């Protein structure tokens, strides 16, 4: 009886093992071994806990994030390309996984003023506004790799004074880290030698079922925010901070993204869906 039980347990363990993948099917590093504008680019892999991240120094961009599902099968949960050439000359979306800036999002009328001086930036959005830095930004340049460990990578770029109209030499460092607890963290550090605007961000497109697998409209989401920032028809903030109560922007109680996305609402119409900033509520002590 004992031998029979052991055999059953061993067979069961083998069956469970067969349902789990050995690990993520990573993008080959040779797909990114190239030069862009005379500078070498590469693909780097870091890992922490159950999460594996692949990053390229072209645009300091996240190429893939592999995580296991409840059955232990790994999927890449961000959308992107599998080779460097498609990032250099994208067949579609330019900003997949990229570091965007020096000013993420839009600059109205492609200009801003500091101390009475007007600075003009590229009108690369509807020929009116500046989007994510301009035609070059931080996503179309090769970053220096300062250090790489098993779980982190540090990238650096000096955005020179006057590039695409922005004042100041902007010394920018980004650190991607995957912790032993399977947390993905991004740390930004920027210094400048002139007054300027800095608003750096990362631009991943998440698809939690796996890359390009279905819509996000049935994802359940909650946002601890009582207010959001309305935009005009060209996606420029109006300057108002609006209450979410009674609007499709109220995610304080979790519900699917698609539950109210089809409602008749000026803000949804302006953005053709959700493309807004929420003002996160401070936690009470």
List the predicted regions and their residue ranges.
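Positively charged n-region of N-terminal signal peptides that target proteins for export
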Residues: 1-4
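An exposed, glycine/acidic-rich loop-and-rim segment of catalytic or binding clefts
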Residues: 19-285
């Amino acid at each position: 009886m004992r031998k029979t039980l052991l055999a059953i347990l061993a067979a069961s363990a083998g069956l469970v093992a067969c349902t789990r993948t050995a690990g993520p099917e990573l993008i080959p590093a040779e797909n990114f071994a190239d030069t862009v504008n005379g500078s070498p680019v590469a693909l780097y892999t870091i890992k922490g806990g159950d999460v594996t991240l692949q990053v390229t120094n072209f645009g300091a961009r996240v190429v893939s994030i592999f995580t296991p599902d409840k059955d232990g099968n790994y999927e890449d949960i961000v959308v992107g390309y599998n080779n460097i050439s498609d990032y250099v000359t994208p067949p579609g979306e330019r900003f997949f996984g990229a570091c965007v800036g020096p000013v993420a999002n839009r600059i109205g009328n492609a200009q801003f003023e500091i101390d009475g001086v007007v600075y003009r930036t590229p009108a690369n959005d509807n020929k009116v506004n500046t989007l994510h830095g301009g035609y070059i930004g931080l996503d179309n340049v090769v970053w220096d790799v300062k250090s790489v460990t098993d779980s982190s990578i540090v990238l650096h770029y000096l955005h020179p004074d006057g590039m695409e109209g922005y004042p100041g030499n902007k010394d920018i460092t980004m650190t991607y880290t995957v912790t032993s607890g399977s947390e993905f963290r991004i740390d930004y550090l920027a210094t400048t030698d002139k007054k300027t605007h800095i608003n750096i961000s990362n631009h991943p497109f998440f698809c939690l079922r796996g890359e390009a697998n279905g819509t996000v409209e049935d994802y359940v989401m909650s946002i601890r925010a009582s207010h959001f920032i309305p935009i005009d028809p060209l996606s420029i903030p109006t300057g108002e901070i609006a209450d979410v109560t009674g609007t499709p922007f109220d995610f304080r109680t979790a519900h699917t993204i698609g539950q109210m996305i089809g409602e008749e609402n000026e803000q949804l119409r302006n953005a053709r869906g959700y493309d807004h900033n929420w003002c996160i509520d401070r936690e009470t002590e």
